[in-house]
Amino acid sequence: MKAVFFVPDYQRGYRWGTSEVELLLNDITENGKQHGQNYYLQPIVVKAIGKNNYELIDGQQRLTTLYLILSYLRKQLPSVRIRYDITYETRKETHDYLQNIDFSKKEDNIDFFFIANAFETIEGWFEMKQKNGEDLLGICINFYQQLNENVKVIWYEPEKNVSGVELFTRLNLVVSLSLTQSW
């Protein structure tokens, strides 16, 4: 059964740039070189809103980037299955764009722009590996195996009576204070 993650209107759109996308790809790869060590993603905070349906309170950037990586891998390996979907409360066209990235529409919408750039970064990352003399198909197979076998998601689901907006605000306030205090 496929999980559906619902991005509520209080969240900004997808905004990861090249450095964040490459860091995630490199972290997954480097971890794979350590012979099966698990790689734990930062927590995904969700609230159940139905059977296999979740409000995505925190972790949208990571989950979307993983979705884009899997989309790229599926282009190379048609047997790749993406076991979740991402929908948006106020940006319904973003869901469609994520399903079928059209680079000619990249400039139509800020979400499209960042999604297309992230996908291009992913393509470029795999192509660079290929230029280093490795077989693209082999690279994709190894990466997909690593992703499935050793990448773990830290899943946090608060109590049902906790408001998603409140939790999102608290999580981001803590991050904001931490960043401010580090200056």
Listing of model-derived features with the role each one plays in the protein:
Residues 1-183:
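Glycine- and hydrophobic-rich flexible loops that cap the catalytic core of alpha/beta enzyme folds
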